A protein has these predicted regions:
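Helix-rich cap/lid subdomain of alpha/beta-hydrolase
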Residues: 1-24, 28-33
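Secondary-structure boundary motif
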Residues: 3, 74-78, 109
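Conserved serine/cysteine hydrolase catalytic core
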Residues: 20-75, 81-84
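Catalytic histidine-centered segment of alpha/beta-hydrolase-like enzymes
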Residues: 82-101
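C-terminal alpha-helix
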Residues: 103-108
Length: 109
């Protein structure tokens, strides 16, 4: 995952306390980092939703640079809306937690 600064230390502390686990090989994330080695199987996959969908992304996200976001929008703009959050990197809730809540609330209500 891309490295980014975070001013919300309470959020970082929560992640540190609940998202890592100690193993016989040391400390590790609780998710399976091997999943990133096979993401190419999703390229060209056409997701279908039977409900409204919203893609929230940070304007400064390294993973949304280049043609990545353009390609995602081309492929899915017919079935989902896109919301860019200014001054946020890849992990949008870390940078702008209240803005993410507002975006979701405005979408739902």
């Amino acid at each position: 995952m891309p490295k980014q600064e975070c001013l919300n230390t309470w959020f970082l502390r929560y992640i540190a306390e609940y998202s890592i686990t100690q193993t016989d090989k040391g400390w590790r994330w609780k998710f399976d980092d091997n999943m990133f080695s096979s993401l190419e199987r999703l390229f060209g996959y056409k997701f279908e939703f039977s409900c409204p969908a919203l893609f929230i992304h940070g304007k400064n996200s390294l993973l949304m640079s280049g043609n990545i976001l353009t390609n995602i929008k081309e492929m899915y703009s017919g079935i989902m809306d896109f919301n860019e959050v200014a001054n946020a990197a890849h992990h949008v809730p870390l940078d702008k937690p209240l803005e993410v809540i507002d975006i979701i609330k405005n979408r739902l209500f």
